[in-house]
From Swiss-Prot:
This is Pre-mRNA-splicing factor spp2. It comes from Emericella nidulans (strain FGSC A4 / ATCC 38163 / CBS 112.46 / NRRL 194 / M139). Belongs to the SPP2 family. Involved in spliceosome maturation and the first step of pre-mRNA splicing. It is found in: Nucleus.
Amino acid sequence: MPSSPPPDGGNANKTSIKPVSLSLGSSKKLPIKKPVSSHTLARRPHHNLPYHHDSDSDDNGGDSEPAFQSVTGFDTLTGRTLDASGAEEKKPLTIPVASGNNWRDRPGVIRRSKGKNLLPKEVQALQEAQSKGEVPGDGDAVGPSMQYGLSFAKQPQNDGGDQKMEDAALPAVEAAEKAKPLTEDEIALQALVRESRGEVEGRSDLVIESTRAGEGEAEEDVNEFYDGHNSETRSFRADVAARPESATLEQYNTIPVEEFGAALLRGMGWKEGQAVGKGKYGSADPSRASTPHIPARRPGFLGIGAKDVSNGKAEVELGAWGKAAMRKGSKKAGEATKNGEGNTEGIYMPVLMRNKKTGEMITEEELAAMAKEAKKRDDSEDWKEERDRNSERSERDKDHHRDRDRDRDSRRLEYDDTYRYESRRNGSSRRDRSRSTSDRHSRRRKYEGDDGDRRDDRYYRDRDRERRSDPVRDRDRNRDRKSRYYDDDRNSSWYSSSTASSKQRNRDRDRDRDNDRDSRRRK
């Protein structure tokens, strides 16, 4: 007995439960929809499947069958489906960056030990897949197998019977054959055999076993091996050996030029829709991660490193330069001021300079004014120095004239002294001659009587008195002459001083000669 036809698709969608009808014929069974419980998990949407077509809509009443897909398994780490046909969906081109291409990982570089990664293996594998650009779509990833919350250990089920014990397999002990040391006869015999075969070089039987880092060995031990004494050559060879192989021409041809940059960024962890720059790929803030970095425009007429003190008001047009652009900007600024708007386009902003000694900030105009004042000050200082030099020159001229007059006076005095000395010496010679004559007369009158003797005694007394007074006068005269000569020698030139000294020596020599002659006569 056929059942009544079901209601329309639209009404069926509105109702939660359809009426059940039975049929005894071979008619096709209609699917029965069960009410959705809030305790059950939502099904994975079909649009995540690779063979699902978005063109399929629900206009057919929801009776359209999904696309056929044969799945052989699931990846427990990344949550990807393994297709039986082996066909893979087209993935965006990605150029992975070699993780070993880091200078910190090179031999000879001191590396710090990394902390232990406490994340589950599933999360670590998911992060590694994301770094390689193999992240599945939304909803495809399977969560980690770790259970959160309160968990109980599973109790073994024991029915109370005897448990079957299996015999443990005994490890196979292999007898290691120990190599016996060769005797001297055997060594000599092997040497003869090698010589007969033409093998001149002998072979050593020694074996040095190398220890390799096992899987359970700590990473610090491996780092200690690399952190040993490594020369530059060893480090260079290790770096060259760690380099990947060069790409072939076919590999270059398979990568389109317009997709190379995006593929390289994907290999570095970049995703579609993210902003490029400033390293904000993994930012937790989505707005910050998707906001592109726009470089700030440099204010007008400012060089590299200069700071803008106008708060961004010194903007000029591209290509504007010179006084014409400044006048144009000033006109615009005047019009804007009249209209009530603060347009300062094209206004020249002076570059401030800092004085290293005082720390004062000055402009170019102030620096030029300071340089002009410094020049005037230098000119005035030069005039003062010139005046001082002129005064010193005049003083030197006066001293020169004074010395010349003094030399002339000294020469005149020397001439007078020489004249007096010569006249005195001539007078003394005449006196000596007269004395010698009187001596002869006295000797002649010696025999003449007592009157002659008295006259001779008076003459001798007068002569002795004169002699006693002459040395005192000579000493005073010599002292005055020496002091005068000393002053002349100190203030006069070298020639005048040498001349005076020579004359003085001559006078002293003459005086000594006269004294010697007088002394001889006195005897």
